[in-house]
Amino acid sequence: MTKNIVITVDGPSGAGKGTLCYALANRLGFALLDSGAIYRVTALAALQCKADLTNEAELAELAAHLDIEFLPEAGEVKVMLGGEDVSGLIRTQEVADAASKVAVFPQVRSALLQLQKDFATPKGLIADGRDMGTVVFPTAQVKLFLDASAEERAKRRFKQLQNKGISGNFDQILAEIKDRDFRDRNRPVAPLKPADDALLLDSTTLSIEEVIAQALSYIHQKVKI
C-alpha cells in the first residue's frame, strides 16, 4: 500500500463532491477534509469570540490555532471544533456571510493552507474543495475534478430544498449558482480549475453510484490500497 495517499476532489458548488468524498472515505477507510467547511468554522470561531472581521492579522492568528475534525458518521459528516459538533452552526446564513469575508484575506488563506496540509496522514486522505489539487495538495497521487451543468446542479439543489420542506425558486437558485461559478473561476487567488493531471468526471447524466464507481476504478488504477 502506498503511504500517505491523498485523493483530491475539486469542483463547483452542487456537483456532488460532498457525497462522493463521504463515500470514498467510508469505502477506503480514509480521513476526510472538507475545505469549504474549514472557512465556515473559522468564521464561526471569529463570531463566537467577537473578533474583528476586518482585522486580517487577528483572523489569521485565530485560523492558525483551530482544532478541527471531520467525522463521517451515519451517512453524513460531523464537523467538530474543539471537540464540539458545530455541523449545524456553520450552516447559518450569518456564518456563510462571515466566511465570505474571512476567505478574502491572504494571511487567513495562508494559515488555513497549512492547517489543511496537516490533515494528510498515513491513514490516507480524501480532500474535498475547489483548489485541493491545484494549491493545497499539488503532489496528490490521485486528483479528481467533479463537474455538472449549472442547470443540473440547480435542479439538485431545488430538489434538496423541496425534500426538506423548504420553498425555493429554481430561477433564483440557477442564477446564484452561475454567479458563484463566475466568482470562483475568476478570483485572483486560487481560481476554480481542474489540475492538469486530474480526471474530469461530469456527473450531469450520471447517478451517484456511477460517479463513485468511476472514481474508485480510477483510484485503483493510480495507487495500491
From Swiss-Prot:
Which reactions fall under this protein's catalytic activity? CMP + ATP = CDP + ADP; dCMP + ATP = dCDP + ADP
Q: Name one GO molecular function term.
A: ATP binding
GO biological process per UniProt: nucleobase-containing small molecule interconversion; pyrimidine nucleotide metabolic process
Identify the domain of life.
Answer: Bacteria
Amino acids binding ATP = 11-19
Name where it's found. Answer: Cytoplasm
CC annotations in GO: cytosol
The record's section on SUPFAM superfamilies has: P-loop containing nucleoside triphosphate hydrolases
State the family named in the UniProt similarity comment for this chain.
Belongs to the cytidylate kinase family. Type 1 subfamily.
Primary location: cytoplasm
**InterPro entries the UniProt entry points to:** Cytidylate_kin, Cytidylate_kinase_dom, P-loop_NTPase
Ubl conjugation in keyword set: no
Record-given protein name: Cytidylate kinase
User: Which Enzyme Commission number(s) are listed?
Assistant: 2.7.4.25
Lineage runs:
Bacteria, Pseudomonadati, Pseudomonadota, Gammaproteobacteria, Pasteurellales
Query: What species is given as this protein's source?
Result: Mannheimia succiniciproducens (strain KCTC 0769BP / MBEL55E)
Query: Sorted alphabetically, which keywords does the UniProt record give?
Result: ATP-binding, Cytoplasm, Kinase, Nucleotide-binding, Transferase
Q: Which gene encodes it?
A: cmk
